Amino acid sequence: MTALGMTEKNFLQTCTPVVFRRIDVASVPFEELSLVHTIYADLMHAIGRQIIPEGGQPLPARAIYMSKERLRNGNVRVDNESAFTAALRERGVGIVYPEEMGFRDQIKLWASNPTVIGFSGASLHTSIFFPERRVITLAHGPDIWANQCLIDMANNNDAQYLYDANGLEHIGAGNGFNMNYRIRNPEQLASELAEYALS
């Protein structure tokens, strides 16, 4: 509420039944897998400025990878991600674990404007709080989840969509995830990705 400039006074609480003759409900500015309006980005940018009013210390030469390896359950996971993150770390790519960060820290990370890399997922959607971020989205196959494309388009991100030419090995559901994949050659993918991201 604070980031939106609102207090409890902006809300109506009724303790008895009430009939409203008319209620206007705004259309959604973002609809999953379907559409996004620029006003959605405007709102998110305003929230970002409220949460991090000082902005971030720019780190344009820095690349970080948003890892899911510590998630206990979720939608999609890369089974051998720890080998991949170790190889990225050796090549100078920072590793962060969004699920272990507070909301403000996640937003502050985007404010510093590094190149952010990650497998397609909701953690990359938080780029929307600051305009024109640099994002490299790794797909689990030759197609990409539309939500990331919508966020990148609305935010005017410098977005790249990549996938491993060797293909990820499809393992199936299990261990708390709806789908598991395995990188066939973590060292090779990390080497190629680090060279691409840091060049």
Locate predicted features.
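The feature primarily captures lumenal catalytic ectodomains
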Residues: 1-199
